[in-house]
Amino acid sequence: MSNVLDELIERGYAKQFTHEEETRKLLSEEKVTFYIGFDPTGDSLHVGHFIALMLMARMQKAGHRPIVLIGGGTAMVGDPTGKTDMRKMLTREEINHNVECLKKQMSRFIDFSDDKAIIVNNAEWLMGQNYIEFLREVGVHFSVNKMLTAECFKQRMEKGLSFLEFNYMLMQGFDFYKLNEKYDCKMELGGDDQWSNMIAGVELIRRKSNKKAYAMTSALLTNSEGKKMGKTEKGALWLDAEKTSPYDFFQYWRNVNDADVEKCLSMLTFLPMDEVRRLASLKDQEINKAKEVLAYEVTKLVHGEEEAKKALNSSKALFGGGTNMDNVPTVSIPEDMLSSSILDVLVHTKIIPSKGEGRRLVQQGGITLNDTKVEDFNYEITKEDFNDDGFALVRRGKKKYYKIVIG
C-alpha cells in the first residue's frame, strides 16, 4: 500500500498534525478508516467542500476507507467556527432535505460500492441522546477553561457565544468517539479552521477508550492574497449545475490570477506534479493555456467530461471570436421591457447589481452589446438588438458574457 501522506504534503493539502510521524507510519502499514464531517446547512456542496472531497478521493485511491459524516445532528446546533454571528437554525425537515441532496452529490466523487466508503449521519446517535447521560459520559472530559482558549470560539466571545453553540465542540468530539467505537475510525481530516474541534475528538478517544487517534487539517482554498476562493458576484461557486452552470464554473477557473494557477492545479486536479509545475511555469500569454487546462480538469471532475468539453468549446469560441453560444448563461426580459434603457435591462437581469455600478462600467468601457461598446447610459434596447437566434449578447468587463432573450 502506498503512503499517501507525502503526496498530500507535496500537493499542499496537509497543514497540521497531531502526530505526523505516527500518522505516516499508520498510513503505510494498514488500511485506515478516516472521516471528514459535512454539515448539511445547504442543499449543495460548494468549492470550499471540494478540497475535502479531493482529499477523500486521494486517500481512497491509496487504499484507505473514507467515512462521510453528514452532520444532521450538529446542524441543529450550528458550528460557530469563523462566524461573528449565530447561524440561522434550520428545521429538521430542511436538514433532512439537505442531507439527501449532499448524499447524491458526494456519490459523484467517492466510490461507495462494496463498502469502500460509508455515509453516516450523526443524527443517528445525537438526536436520541439523553442529556444527563451525555454530560456524564462526555462533558466530564472537557475543561471549560481550555475550551475558551480555542480559536474557533475567539471571534464569538466579544459578541456573545450561545451555550447552544458552545456544545458544538463536545458534539464533534463525540462524533469521532462514536465512529472510532463502531467503525474503528482512527483519523479525522478537516479544514484548518476545525483544528480545536478535531483535537477534542482525539483527546476524548484517548481518555474514554485508551486508544490512539489522529487528526490532520488541510489548507483552506485561498488565493495568493489569503482570501478564500470560490466566491463570485452571484455568491458561492456551487458544485450543483442548477446553482452554478458548468459554463460559469469553467469560466471561474479560466479567470484565476496567474499566481494561483499552481496551487489550484495541485489541489483540484489529478494531474501529476511534474505536469502541474510545467503548466505553472508558463509565462505571459502562455499561462492562459494552463488556466484552460485547470478549468477543463476541474469542470470534468465536478460536471463530467461532456459538460467540460462544452464549456471549453464555448470559451474558445467566445475568446476566439467564434459563434458557439450554447453554454453562455442566458437571462431573460419581458417583452414590455423593450425600449427600456440598457441600465434598466442590466439591473433587471442581474448582470449588474445597480445602476450606479452600471454607470461606472459604461464610463470605463466595460459594457458591450453585440460587440459594440456601450457609451450612452440611456441607450434603449429594441428588437433590432436581437439576432436571428433570438438573443442579444452582452459582455461585462473582459470575460463575462450573457445572452439576453425575450420571454
From Swiss-Prot:
EC numbers: 6.1.1.1
What are the S4 RNA-binding domain coordinates in residue numbering?
A: 340-406
Positions annotated to bind ATP: 231
**Localization per Swiss-Prot or TrEMBL:** Cytoplasm
Q: Which GO terms describe its molecular function?
A: ATP binding; RNA binding; tyrosine-tRNA ligase activity
Instruction: Look at the named UniProt entry and state the broad enzyme category this protein falls under.
Output: ligase
Q: Which residues form a coiled coil?
A: none
* Biological process, per Gene Ontology: tyrosyl-tRNA aminoacylation
Chain ranges for the short sequence motif 'HIGH' region as given in the UniProt record: 40-49
Sequence motif 'KMSKS' region, location on chain: 228-232
Q: Which CDD domains does the UniProt record give?
A: TyrRS_core
Q: Which GO terms describe its cellular component?
A: cytosol
InterPro entries linked to this entry: aa-tRNA-synth_I_CS, aa-tRNA-synth_Ic, Rossmann-like_a/b/a_fold, S4_RNA-bd_sf, SYY-like_C, Tyr-tRNA-ligase, Tyr-tRNA-ligase_bac-type, Tyr-tRNA-ligase_bac_1
What is the superkingdom listed in this entry's lineage? Answer: Bacteria
Please provide the record's keywords in A-Z order.
Aminoacyl-tRNA synthetase, ATP-binding, Cytoplasm, Ligase, Nucleotide-binding, Protein biosynthesis, RNA-binding
Q: Which catalysed reactions does the entry list for this protein?
A: tRNA(Tyr) + L-tyrosine + ATP = L-tyrosyl-tRNA(Tyr) + AMP + diphosphate + H(+)
NCBIfam families linked to this entry: tyrS
The UniProt entry's sequence similarity note says: Belongs to the class-I aminoacyl-tRNA synthetase family. TyrS type 1 subfamily.
The record's PANTHER family line, in alphabetical order, gives: TYROSINE--TRNA LIGASE, MITOCHONDRIAL, TYROSYL-TRNA SYNTHETASE
Q: So what does this one do?
A: Catalyzes the attachment of tyrosine to tRNA(Tyr) in a two-step reaction: tyrosine is first activated by ATP to form Tyr-AMP and then transferred to the acceptor end of tRNA(Tyr).
Name this protein carries in UniProt: Tyrosine--tRNA ligase 1
The UniProt gene name for this protein comes to: tyrS1
